[in-house]
A protein has these predicted regions:
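Catalytic cores of Mg2+-dependent Asp-rich isoprenoid enzymes
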Residues: 1-177, 183-284
Length: 284
């Protein structure tokens, strides 16, 4: 009973992270079936904690760069250790480890994620090769972690791997989400953090990034129907929320306020997804 209570407490702690940090993903996860909802929130929580180490919270607390790196390294060690042992005194790590052990999330996904987070402490400007490596570790593997949850949560048997088509779709959706966030945060990344992920300050480059985003979103949309039924509405909502952001980014010059989707539009997108609609495709 104590172990079960601890697991439940860890899951609840992880769920509080997404409620505090993300209206878009928080809205989408509410459309997930109960089989997977808590698991995905636990994945998000670990990702968010690591991101906060490198994106400002640790620095705001007075940690110098070397201490931020040490803290990130310690979180990675704690995570990998908990995945092996099944326990962590860190509630967010414990919740993630329980999900990883059940759903077949292994070090081959976790280590690239932390490698990309570490890059944020070491690299200020990316070329196309380092951009692609960063996006794989910071976003595509997160999509693959969620995919492992979708196909394995609640299974009585050993975890299985998703189909190659679903793997490709998860990667392209994760890449699109990350590139959209890069464009939304271009000024803040440059001014506050001194980072350039895209080199997209020229209009032609910005257009090329948006074209790539649309291609990734369209490719990912084609795979949603192959997901388990209790995951499709949530993925459709997340896809369409970011597709709406991409549309609004294309209409902006990137110099004004951070582009966002108004709450009534978010609600309409979520309602459409909940009704069973397919993801929108720009180039259908």
């Amino acid at each position: 009973m104590t172990s079960s209570l601890y697991d439940q407490t860890a899951t609840a702690a992880a769920a509080s992270v997404i409620r505090a940090y993300s209206t878009s993903f928080g809205l989408a996860t509410r459309l997930l079936g109960p089989r997977v909802r808590g698991h995905v929130r636990s994945v998000y929580a670990l990702v968010r904690v690591a991101d906060e180490i490198v994106d400002g919270a640790a620095a705001a607390a007075g940690l110098p760069l070397a201490a931020q790196r040490d803290t990130l390294d310690a979180l990675e060690r704690e995570t990998l250790g908990a995945m092996a042992s099944g326990f962590s005194a860190n509630l967010v790590v414990h919740a993630f480890a329980q999900v990883a052990r059940e759903c077949g999330i292994h070090a081959d996904l976790v280590e690239p994620f932390f490698a990309s987070m570490r890059t944020d402490l070491e690299t200020t400007a990316h070329d196309s090769a380092s951009h692609d490596a960063y996006v794989y570790g910071s976003a595509e593997v997160v999509g693959l972690m969620c995919l492992q949850v979708f196909v394995n949560a609640g299974r009585p048997d050993a975890p299985v791997q998703a189909s190659p088509a679903l793997v490709a779709g998860a990667r392209r959706l994760g890449a699109a989400f990350q590139d959209i966030n890069f464009l939304r945060d271009l000024a803040d990344d440059a001014e506050r953090l001194g980072r350039d992920y895209l080199g997209a300050d020229r209009p032609s480059s910005r257009t090329a990034v948006l074209d790539r985003i649309d291609a990734d979103l369209d490719a990912a949309a084609l795979t949603v129907a192959d997901l388990p039924a209790d995951c499709r509405s949530a993925v459709t909502a997340a896809h369409d929320l970011f597709a709406e952001l991409a549309r609004r980014l294309r209409s902006s010059d990137g110099t004004g306020a951070r582009v966002r989707v108004p709450d009534p539009v978010k609600a309409a997108i979520a309602a459409r997804a909940a009704a069973g609609a397919r993801p929108r495709r720009r180039n259908a």
